[in-house]
């Protein structure tokens, strides 16, 4: 098999502005401490994290033939992500997320660009056959992929792949429309807010149990409080590790990378959860979503 994971996702860079300030309208200029252009997008950050752990990773998405698109493809390639299947369009513009990070929280403004343009029909059976697993993130942003995504997961299963989904946040805050998709999902990876919003449950464990009646395995990210995983037969929990947090951008995507590393290597669930929590925590020690992502050897120092 050529690839461990194929990611169908979005390709936008992040412009991260850090400082203890809030923007103010009225042509008021505020000074930030640092500014950096980094790999952005949940799918791309996940891809880099998985490759950093040693998985063979391929990516398919849509970007423009422009500065931001070329930046993303170059930076992902440097991190051993195969981008040969990315669709580059001359008649569209790669988007951008501007993130204002004041250390305790962050605000995000996104120009979606070509995020919504990937379709299920762009993902051939031949490409699927080269992979063991198919991962999709940013479900609510990939609007042209949404309608046929259940069929794409079905195609993947017929060809022997397992599937995973991280919806990420729903900008419309409607949180519906993917029950059929969850039923065809092997691993569902929401965070606490997403799990509670989707299920309308009053607590995380109840939310995870409800989701596990559809997806085969659910792992809920709880930030500094660790994580909780639920299948139809069991519930497992893991703590995180204490680190000096610089930037939480992409921590959930690094968690996903660690979780799917363990899942694809048939680890026990408790060990898989622990690696995921460690990967998420370690990634927050540097600015941007990918700079702090660990190699497997470093992450395993915290995994028994």
Report the location of each language-model feature.
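Short, basic and Ser/Thr-rich N-terminal targeting/leader segments
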Residues: 53, 92-94, 223
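Conserved phosphate-binding/catalytic region of the ribokinase-like
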Residues: 1-5, 31, 155, 204-304
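Ribokinase/PfkB-type carbohydrate-kinase core domain
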Residues: 1-13, 75-88, 102-237
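Residues at secondary-structure transition points
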Residues: 33-41, 45, 67, 89, ...
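Short glycine/serine/threonine/alanine-rich loop segments
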Residues: 55, 81, 161, 267, ...
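A general structural signal for well-ordered alpha-helical segments in protein cores
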Residues: 43-47, 69, 149, 192, ...
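Glycine-rich phosphate/adenosyl-contacting loop at the front of the ribokinase-like
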Residues: 1-63, 67-74, 78, 246
């Amino acid at each position: 098999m050529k690839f461990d994971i194929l990611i169908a996702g979005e390709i936008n860079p992040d412009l991260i502005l850090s400082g203890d300030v809030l923007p103010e309208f009225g042509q008021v200029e505020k000074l930030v401490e640092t500014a950096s252009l980094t790999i952005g997008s949940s799918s791309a950050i996940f891809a880099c994290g998985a490759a950093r752990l040693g998985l063979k990773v391929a990516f398919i998405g849509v970007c423009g033939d422009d500065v931001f698109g070329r930046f993303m493809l170059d930076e992902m390639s440097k991190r051993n992500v195969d981008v040969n299947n990315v669709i580059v369009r001359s008649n569209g513009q790669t988007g951008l997320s501007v993130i204002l990070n004041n250390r305790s929280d962050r605000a995000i403004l996104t120009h979606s660009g070509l995020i919504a343009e990937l379709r299920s029909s762009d993902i051939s059976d031949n490409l699927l056959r080269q992979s063991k697993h198919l991962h999709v993130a940013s479900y609510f942003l990939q609007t042209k992929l949404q309608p046929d995504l259940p069929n794409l997961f079905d195609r993947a299963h017929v060809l022997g792949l397992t599937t995973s989904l991280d919806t990420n946040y729903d900008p419309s805050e409607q949180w519906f429309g993917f029950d059929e998709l969850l039923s065809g999902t092997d691993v569902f990876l929401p965070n606490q807010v997403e799990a509670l919003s989707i299920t309308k449950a009053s607590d995380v464990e109840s939310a995870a149990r409800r989701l596990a009646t559809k997806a085969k395995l659910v792992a809920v990210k709880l930030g500094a409080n660790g994580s909780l995983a639920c299948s139809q037969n069991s519930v497992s929990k893991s703590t995180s590790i204490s680190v000096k947090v610089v930037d939480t951008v992409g921590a959930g995507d690094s968690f996903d990378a660690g979780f799917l590393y363990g899942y694809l290597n048939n680890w026990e669930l408790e060990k898989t959860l622990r690696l995921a929590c460690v990967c998420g925590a370690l990634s927050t020690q540097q600015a941007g979503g990918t700079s702090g992502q660990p190699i497997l050897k470093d992450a395993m120092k915290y995994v028994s």
